[in-house]
Regions:
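Cofactor-binding loops of NAD(P)H-dependent oxidoreductases
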Residues: 62
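Oxidoreductase cofactor-interface core, primarily capturing Rossmann-like NAD(P)-dependent enzymes
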Residues: 2-51, 65-68, 72-77, 85-99, ...
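Short, conserved active-site loop motifs that form the nucleotide-linked donor/cofactor pocket
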Residues: 56-58, 147
Length: 225
């Protein structure tokens, strides 16, 4: 199959998690490149959703656990950015949400499906947070979707989780990782930039599985910065 570069495209992307960290980063980068964007939201009247409207993003009402609404949301679009929140819904529901979106993309002929998984998803860890995303990856491959799988490591923004940030403000970096252990992190914005790059250069990125990391430091090295 031959793919053409789609820079400065007038094609539309569906972004899930658009009011969240990863989806929001994708929105920022794709708007800067003048793409047309559609955001799936359960509540079109929410503050976050209305902020998107003000930036020119089309809203479509739907729920990732409702296959019918997901299929409607994917009609007539070029690409999908797929991300689900394990911490909000748990492993079983996260898997179903991811599979529902992949199934809908297959039915409606989506041309590029970018899925945000997790670093090490393929390593049979037995940990729910990893295994749930691996199951979604397997569905994407089984369907034969033209896909790019991004596997980001831990988020730099986790340092702003309440308990961690409080410790930092008191001069302590509270983290269970050993002090001599190198620890990979990545910023949400970098994930958005990689997703944007994948959508603009499908000939390079479709069929790729990419682990994403922005830094590799010990906690003392991080604290020193």
């Amino acid at each position: 199959m031959k793919f053409e570069n789609v820079q400065n495209s007038d094609k539309t992307l569906l972004v899930t998690g658009a009011t969240g960290r990863q989806g929001g980063a994708v929105i920022r980068h794709m708007l800067a490149k003048e793409w047309k964007l559609r955001a799936l939201t359960r509540d079109q009247g929410s503050y976050g959703a209305q902020q998107l409207v003000g930036r020119g993003v089309e809203l479509v009402q739907g729920d990732l656990e409702d296959p019918g609404s997901v299929e409607r949301a994917t009609r007539g679009i070029y690409g999908v950015f797929s991300v689900q929140d394990f911490w909000a819904v748990g492993a079983r529901r996260e898997m179903q949400q991811g599979k529902n979106l992949a199934d809908a993309a297959k039915k409606t002929g989506v041309e590029h499906f970018v899925y945000s998984s997790v670093g090490g998803a393929e390593r049979n860890s037995g940990i729910d947070h990893w295994e749930s995303k691996w199951e979604v990856e397997k569905r994407i491959r089984k369907l034969g979707l033209p896909a790019t799988i991004l596997r980001p490591v831990a988020f730099m923004e986790n340092y702003y989780i309440d308990q961690v940030e409080i410790g930092i403000l008191k001069g302590k970096l509270m983290d269970p990782i050993r002090a001599d252990k190198k620890y990979q992190t990545i910023a949400d914005d970098d994930i958005g930039e990689f997703a944007a790059l994948a959508f603009e250069r499908p000939e390079e990125f479709i069929g790729q599985e990419l682990e994403l990391a922005g830094s590799e430091l010990t906690n003392p090295e991080t604290a020193a910065q």
